[in-house]
Amino acid sequence: MAKFVPAIFLDRDGTINVDHGYVHEIDAFEFIDGVIDAMRELKKMGYALVVVTNQSGIARGKFTEAQFETLTEWMDWSLADRDVDLDGIYYCPHHPQGSIEEFRQVCDCRKPHPGMLISARDFLHIDMAASYMVGDKLEDMQAAAAANVGTKVLVRTGKPVTAEAENAADWVLNSLADLPSAIKKQQK
């Protein structure tokens, strides 16, 4: 029987990197201060790290899937060079009003739907109750709730925090950089 592992599900734009809007080029990708160290610490604490990101810019024709994949590969290698190995990267290229027909659809992977988290759970054998979802928007919290993620963490490094998002979260932190110490404090 497979051993189940706890995970940190991570939104990308506004959580891992500064959200400049439809980030798809290496030059525009800027890691938020402290997140790489935090991710390294979370790995040491025994968590799988799984990126779950809506990328509607693909459906909207702002950038191609190939451009997204090139940037994602660069991000993955940049993190690996700093001793942060991601366990999974899941993305949704769809949008119901997309201008690119192949990606114009209602799907179950676009947050607030839980599809990406469920796929990761099944593939990586994740213990959802012991896991955390970290994101900057209400949709991240809703996806986590729908997937039965144990702790929903809203961060202030992305979109302005709304009261609705705050109410949907279990924790509100200034940044992903603060998560390792928050988890340690809670586990005492």
UniProtKB/Swiss-Prot annotation:
Chain positions recorded as Mg(2+) binding sites: 11, 13, 136-137
Active-site positions on this chain: 11 (nucleophile), 13 (proton donor)
Superkingdom in the source lineage: Bacteria
Marked site positions, Contributes to substrate recognition: 110
Stabilizes the phosphoryl group (site feature) positions: 53, 111
Localisation: Cytoplasm
Annotated Pfam families: Hydrolase_like
Binding, substrate: 11-13, 19-22, 53-56, 110-111, 137
Cofactor: Mg(2+); Zn(2+)
UniProt main location, coarse: cytoplasm
Gene Ontology annotations of biological process type: ADP-L-glycero-beta-D-manno-heptose biosynthetic process; lipopolysaccharide core region biosynthetic process
EC supergroup of this enzyme: hydrolase
Catalytic reaction annotation: D-glycero-beta-D-manno-heptose 1,7-bisphosphate + H2O = D-glycero-beta-D-manno-heptose 1-phosphate + phosphate
Gene Ontology molecular functions: D-glycero-beta-D-manno-heptose 1,7-bisphosphate 7-phosphatase activity; magnesium ion binding; zinc ion binding
Record's GO cellular component terms: cytoplasm
Keyword terms of this UniProt record: Carbohydrate metabolism, Cytoplasm, Hydrolase, Lipopolysaccharide biosynthesis, Magnesium, Metal-binding, Zinc
Enzyme Commission code: 3.1.3.82
List of residues binding Zn(2+): 92, 94, 107, 109
Pathway linked to the protein: Nucleotide-sugar biosynthesis; ADP-L-glycero-beta-D-manno-heptose biosynthesis; ADP-L-glycero-beta-D-manno-heptose from D-glycero-beta-D-manno-heptose 7-phosphate: step 2/4; Bacterial outer membrane biogenesis; LPS core biosynthesis
CDD domains: HAD_HisB-N
Subunit annotation: Monomer.
Similarity field: Belongs to the GmhB family.
Protein known as: D-glycero-beta-D-manno-heptose-1,7-bisphosphate 7-phosphatase
This protein's encoding gene: gmhB
